[in-house]
Amino acid sequence: MPITNALSVDVEDYFQTEAMAAAAPRNSWGSFPSHVEANTRSLFELFAKYDIRATFFFLGWVAERYPRLVSEARQLGHEIGCHSYWHRPVFHLSPTEFREDTSRAKQVIEDAAGVAVAGYRAPCFSINSSVGWAHGILEELGFQYDSSSNPVRHAFYGDHRGHRRPFPVSEGLHELPIATWRILGQNLPVGGGAYLRIMPYWLVKSGLSSINRTESRPGILYLHPWEIDEAQPRLEVSLISRARQYTRLSQMKEKLERLLRQFKFGTVYETVYLPLVNKNNRAPDCLATPAPLRRSSAC
């Protein structure tokens, strides 16, 4: 029986990425034309075509302005997660700043979704050994898992020496790393995002197949709504930032659809987290179906 992988979406607008930070400071976000609703709904339609439920990690800023988008995702059966409020890398924050940002985002997202949020993903995969205190704060705020580890070599984020497999950070919190393919002594980033846009499709497919077949476990993939938006406005940023943001946007949707046809996908909670902590593999009611917000030990 094919392994079900985890598909996740970091819901942010095109002007909210680190690559666009120089041209779109946070205090100017409201002045940019938003594409996040249309792009996210395009993903809703694509996932519905293949009967796929994914995890949508919402930016709190987006959830506060477009609460209906959050509730739509929930009503469609997708898991709702938290992607911070202001999209500031955690290693640029103090513990107090991180707590305030994350708490605000979680509250806004839960109010819009009507269910408690179990999962967190840091902007730019920015929880690493230098900010180990962040895990304790996540647990205190009621999160059950973090998916902020991307164990690859990268100029800005990641730790190529980090764990590739999910692991418990504490009794109440698990870390669920993004998919990497261990080959020739290196961790090859096959977990999506810019890597899916830029790398040959066969390489991503081979890496995910190897994780499923050789390691007998699911991989976690991610993308952003703006990555399927070839028509997004081009902002005046550096050459390297343009390359990070705009390279092969035209290929992303076709590559994503090929993955959806060739692999099975589900939410991060049900395909990766639950098997780690619950042998019965049954989700709590608050995550299995749309339900009023309940702050219980299960959620």
Which residues are covered by each model-predicted region?
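Catalytic alpha-helical scaffold of carbohydrate-active enzymes acting on polysaccharides/glycoconjugates
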Residues: 1-119, 124-184, 203-299
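Surface-exposed cleft-lining segments at the edges of enzyme active sites
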Residues: 188-198
